[in-house]
């Protein structure tokens, strides 16, 4: 089959290959007949990048492809490849032997009969063996893009002929010597999937299991027949309305690793498709073997033109949402489980070990709370806690932030692994949206609530507003709102309300209490500003 090998073959690129070395590198089939050779120089195969946000164009070559992203491609043949040549009687003849030169960069094919059987300028085709997937024997006019495919090696296109690769060319009789020369032009298009996972803790612990591509629109292709049997006329590829509906192709993979950046060597996966202008839905399935959790990422690419003989690099960032569970005692220098992350429980109402117990024993993780006296402003002193909302700002978020509750039974990253969590949370208006909608300045938002006769809650306890019931309708948009997950809290190392209730510190102690600090609290049925003990472990976060 035609070999699309990935990687640079140094010996093949040398311009100083001696005759002896050439002989050593030849793979020869001893048969008699007419020689059709591809001894023209390596052709340039253009490549293009298809990122999730981008689409491109490019150009291509003669035989098969040694592909390096960003550097085009080279060409090579394999020992089981064959070609078709049309003789003077209009009959297609299949080659009966092949001799490889220069590691496959050149090849001599043996055709049956004599040179006089073939016209100068006769047509040559390559169709591989893909049609056998549909139960047919290879012909010069049939190919297939198998609906179900598998790969055993990353960064390898050595079975392109089984996946639908095809091409054609014109053979010329060289100086009436009886030996014909041809250059093959590829007529299929090629996708090279290059996924990554940008979470450095998670990437080493997950594997790429499957890629599924669905054609949702095609300009010249009936996408119901995107896969399986197609007709090839030497120039164009046409779907044949195969009776099996097949708008998608699935590639199963043997646990390819993922890295934080593109790693062609370790996980590049190739696919052959019919040229056209498409909309694609591409689904990548990854698995964490430790937790046995799988998740699928879906990327949609629209209006992408795939031209004949061109390679398109398709990148994708397969990074799931992270819980980022950094609970703090109020005004602590470090988070609750700092240095003891592996002790942090994930199951609700279970207790972890090595939680902070006193300022003397855990000066980094324990609260810096000091009560200055009643009705005296008590601001956080650590640099991080100075950046989180103060209590007045939190009132605006809670009572004028138009909260929307959502529940996501989804997959998250937690401490370098995938976990399945039934996670609730709320969407709130961003500060800029609140100020615009309420007609207030940032200074007003910082110094009191409500707008009329405001109370500065840092020093005074005013009239508490009624709890807000969050909407369960979809959030109007995600550009003017931001999301807060319900990550629960810790008391004495015990996790509580994980996934069902959210607690977020403010930067102010409550002026009416010896040991309480203001916080935002929410569930599916209420949103409020309240207060809790400084020794609780809840989330501290800079709000948008």
Residue locations for each model-derived region?
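C-terminal, surface-exposed recognition/capping segments
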Residues: 421-544
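Sec-type signal peptide cleavage vicinity
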Residues: 1-399, 405-408, 422
């Amino acid at each position: 089959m035609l070999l699309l090998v990935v990687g640079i073959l140094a010996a093949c690129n040398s311009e100083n290959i001696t005759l002896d070395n050439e002989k050593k590198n030849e793979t020869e089939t001893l048969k008699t007949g007419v020689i059709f050779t591809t001894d023209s120089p390596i052709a340039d195969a253009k490549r293009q990048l298809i990122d999730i946000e981008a689409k491109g164009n490019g150009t291509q070559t003669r035989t098969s492809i040694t592909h390096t992203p960003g550097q085009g491609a080279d060409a090579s043949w394999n020992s089981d490849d064959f070609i078709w040549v049309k003789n003077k009687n209009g009959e297609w003849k299949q080659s009966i032997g092949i001799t490889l030169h220069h590691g496959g960069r050149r090849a001599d094919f043996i055709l049956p009969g004599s040179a006089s059987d073939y016209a100068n300028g006769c047509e040559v085709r390559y169709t591989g063996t893909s049609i056998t997937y549909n139960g047919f024997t290879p012909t010069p006019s049939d190919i297939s893009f198998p609906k179900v495919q598998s790969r055993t090696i990353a960064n390898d296109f050595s079975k392109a002929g089984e996946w639908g690769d095809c091409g054609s060319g014109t053979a010329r009789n060289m100086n009436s010597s009886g030996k014909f020369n041809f250059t093959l032009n590829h007529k299929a298009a090629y996708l090279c999937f290059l996924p990554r996972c940008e979470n450095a803790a998670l990437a080493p612990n997950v594997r790429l299991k499957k890629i599924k591509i669905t054609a949702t629109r095609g300009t010249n292709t009936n996408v119901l027949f995107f896969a399986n049997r197609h007709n090839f006329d030497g120039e164009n590829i046409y779907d044949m309305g195969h009776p099996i509906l097949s708008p998608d192709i699935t590639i199963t993979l043997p646990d390819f690793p993922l890295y934080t950046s593109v790693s062609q060597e370790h996980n590049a996966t190739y696919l052959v498709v019919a040229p056209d202008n498409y909309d694609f839905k591409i689904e990548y399935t990854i698995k964490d073997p430790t937790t046995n959790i799988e998740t699928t990422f879906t990327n949609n690419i629209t209006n992408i033109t795939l031209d004949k003989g061109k390679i398109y690099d398709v990148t994708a960032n397969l990074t799931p949402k992270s819980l980022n569970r950094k609970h703090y005692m109020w005004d602590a220098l470090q988070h609750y489980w700092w240095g003891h992350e592996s002790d942090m429980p994930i199951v609700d109402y279970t207790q972890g070990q090595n939680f902070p117990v006193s300022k003397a024993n855990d000066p980094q993780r324990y609260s810096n709370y000091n009560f200055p006296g009643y009705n005296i402003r008590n601001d956080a002193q650590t640099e991080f806690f100075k950046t989180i909302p103060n209590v007045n700002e939190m009132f605006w978020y809670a009572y004028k932030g138009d909260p929307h509750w959502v529940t996501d039974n989804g997959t998250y990253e937690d401490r370098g692994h995938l976990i399945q969590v039934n996670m609730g949370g709320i969407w709130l208006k961003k500060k800029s949206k609140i100020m615009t909608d309420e007609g207030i300045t940032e200074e007003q938002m910082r110094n009191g609530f409500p707008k009329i006769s405001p109370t500065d809650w840092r020093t005074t306890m005013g009239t508490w507003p009624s709890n807000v019931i969050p909407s369960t309708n979809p959030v109007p948009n995600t550009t003017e709102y931001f999301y807060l997950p319900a990550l629960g809290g810790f008391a004495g190392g015990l996790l509580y309300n994980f996934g069902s209730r959210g607690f977020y510190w403010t930067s102010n102690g409550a002026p009416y209490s010896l040991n309480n600090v203001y916080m935002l609290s929410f569930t599916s049925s209420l949103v409020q500003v309240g207060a809790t003990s400084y020794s609780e472990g809840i989330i501290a976060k800079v709000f948008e």
